[in-house]
Amino acid sequence: MYKIAAENLQALFQKIAADQDLYLPVKVSDQVNFKAWSEDAEVCLDTLKTVKSPKDAFFPQSENLYTCKKEEKNISIEPQALQEKNFVVFGMKACDIQGVKVLDNVFLSDPIDTFYAARRDHGTIVALACHEPEESCFCKVFGIDCADPVADVATWMIEGELYWKPLTEKGEALTKAVAELLNDADEAKVEEEKAAIRAIVEKLPYSNLSLEGWGQEDYMDRFNSPVWEELYKPCLACGTCTFVCPTCQCYDIKDYDTGHGVQRYRCWDSCMYSDFTMMAHGNNRNSQMQRFRQRFMHKLVYYPVNLSLIHISEPTRLLSIS
């Protein structure tokens, strides 16, 4: 276990960014999101949650896959280069890290998504425990411990000092790279901090919500429940919930005519859109109620049954936009 004074964090960021890209919570125009670090960036590690999740670091909102070029009768295809430079995502919360685990199940299963895999291979995650969870938090319901995040490095901000604990080979490598800035620390304060955070979580109003009834048994009763006809009505079909969600991974693949060829690119899509996965045989979900129901059934029933992992990890962010 190590620690570093808060006033020395700028030096820590400089040290990390000297060798690799560094992304962390940065405030821009009154909004905090994960962005590339710079000397004049307003870093906000005390922000409980960013507007968007940091999943962009591993699954970008838009990315080129390959480019087709035509010169007279000759056609060439240039694949997009995979991620080669190492990078660090600093300050991720336990719920967002759980979101990455969900993405891993999707993109690292056969057939492996090489673009995603390259970013995971080159990315190091530094987690930051939630010092004071909000009233709307209920990560405990999904088995997430916000007091003890599991990543390459786990950190806790306690009384003006950042406590630092490497947990993986990547974490050990990063720790070695910044060792001159770290001091040895006793784990006692961290254990006290964990206990204090968990005590807060236990008192939160939604911490004891139950997922009973959302399993495989009787799922058709849930599917056919008349309650969906009421629940979907406030939905604007804007898709914002899917874009800020750390676990949503739906995407579309499109072609863009550059004038000199065609770029094929991948971009996020949303199951809440009326034209989502428009198929030739016409088997689309025609109503917003059906799309709304599919989103929740996918996260709470279909995905857990198939992959033994709940497809929700950060409900508080979704509540803040509703």
Question: What kind of feature is each model-predicted range?
Answer:
Residues 1-218, 248, 310-311:
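Iron-sulfur-associated redox domains of electron-transfer enzymes in respiratory
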Residues 101, 145, 241-247, 251, ...:
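Secreted/processed peptides and extracellular or luminal domains of membrane proteins
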Residues 30-33, 133, 244, 252-255, ...:
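Flexible loop/turn segments at secondary-structure boundaries
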